Amino acid sequence: VIRENEAYDTKNIQADVWDAASEVLPPGLEEGSVDVVLMIFIFSALSPSQWKQVVHNIHRLLKPGGEVLFRDYGRGDLAQVRFKKGRYLEENFYIRGDGTRVYFFEKNELIKIWTGKDVERSDDTPSSTGFEVVNLGVDRRLLVNRAKQLKMYRCWMQGRFGKQEKPQPG
């Protein structure tokens, strides 16, 4: 879709499909060559068993000081509440009718995924992933469809994770 846009210019941007959970980096990109990784509703489609590899791959791609801009589903979102029992894969992880998967995150869970720190246990150890949380919040909204008289409670996680300048011991 991006490549078909008239504004797409290969001198300024490169768009490729990449399996972020594979061990191979995207075509044409070297380790430490990327300033920003944009992850919008990508992480939730991955199996929890793939998260560690994806975080590792993104760390490999980013320059020191580079950032991940993240937005995904939060726990308790309307989409989660609407899932029927037959769509449950594991806790907070579901399969849609079209076969795609979706996970619903909590703030502390994302901190642990991106930094390796367990917030619930007051973990003061340095990041084991090489990332720090720059900003992380929960975006809760009430959307109202007046025509259908529907109230829709939405919940998204939104954050910035920075690659630390110096490698952390571990």
Q: What is each residue range found by the language model?
A:
Residues 38, 69:
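A conserved beta-strand element that flanks and buttresses the S-adenosyl-L-methionine
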Residues 74-145:
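C-terminal alpha-helical "lid/dimerization" subdomain adjacent to the S-adenosyl-L-methionine
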Residues 42:
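Hydrophobic adenine-recognition pocket in adenosine-nucleotide-binding enzymes
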Residues 118-120, 137, 142-170:
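Core SAM-dependent methyltransferase catalytic element
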Residues 51-67:
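A short glycine-rich, Lys/Arg-flanked "PGG" loop and its adjoining helix->strand segment in the class I
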Residues 1-26:
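Class I SAM-dependent methyltransferase SAM/SAH-binding core
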Residues 23-37:
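A short acidic, Gly/Pro-enriched loop at the edge of an enzyme's catalytic core
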